[in-house]
Amino acid sequence: MNQSYIRAKNVVVEFPIYNASHRSLRKSLMRATTGGRVAADASKRVSVRALDNVSFDFKPGDRIGLVGHNGAGKTTLLRVLAGVYAPVAGSLEVKGRIVSLIDLSLGMDQEATGYENIFLRGIMMGIKPKEIEKKLYSIAEFSELGEDFLNMPVRTYSSGMMLRLAFAVSTSIHADIVLMDEWLSVGDAAFNEKATERLSQVVENSSILVLASHSPKLVEKNCNRILTFQHGQIVEA
């Protein structure tokens, strides 16, 4: 039985704003209705509180939809779960292999070849080199980039080609926990069709899905729990 889970208690994420003038602070405060909470501490250091005492418990079978306006904290939470951002307060426990589909190009090197980037992206995701080596052919085949391009630096790729490669690597392993910011669309119509099929399989086989979206239909179709964010806080669960 899958024992994956995500437990958060009073998680806080703040981003410091260096050299912020009083005028820029006032402007930030005026914009606060569409973002996190802006504040200055006793030493006049300005920071944006992107997540403010967020708590939840995700269990196997949960399909979580994160909703809210731009800057509400949805993507910040996904990046915290992916290990990109660290909380400044509170506790976060994650058990299970995470596949993050929010920053597909993360860990890729523009000067390295496509083949080298398969390993770089895979290692960044926590996959052992031996496991990547076993999947190398199937990843290359799924990307449809061909031998010539896979032996070239990815700086020579179009954005679509790079996305194909990153997607092929990211969805090549079993995921206990899947993190998504909207539903991915990859490449031309033909490639996108098989990418959508694979993505559906990855999500179906996962224990927990966390999906941030502005589309009520997408959330309704794929999620069984909804967390509504406002100014970095969960206002409805």
Describe each model-derived feature in a short phrase:
Residues N192-E204:
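Helical segment within the ABC ATPase nucleotide-binding domain
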Residues S213-H214:
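H-loop/switch region of ABC-family ATPase nucleotide-binding domains
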Residues A40-S47, R97, I102-L165, V169-I177, ...:
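ABC-family P-loop ATPase nucleotide-binding domains
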Residues Y5-I17, P60-R63, H69-M125:
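ABC ATPase nucleotide-binding domain signature region
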Residues N2-R49:
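Pre-NBD coupling/linker segments of ABC/ABC-like ATPases
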Residues K221-T228:
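Conserved catalytic segment of ABC-fold P-loop ATPases
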Residues S47, V54, D62-R63:
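Conserved N-terminal flank of the Walker A/P-loop in ABC nucleotide-binding domains
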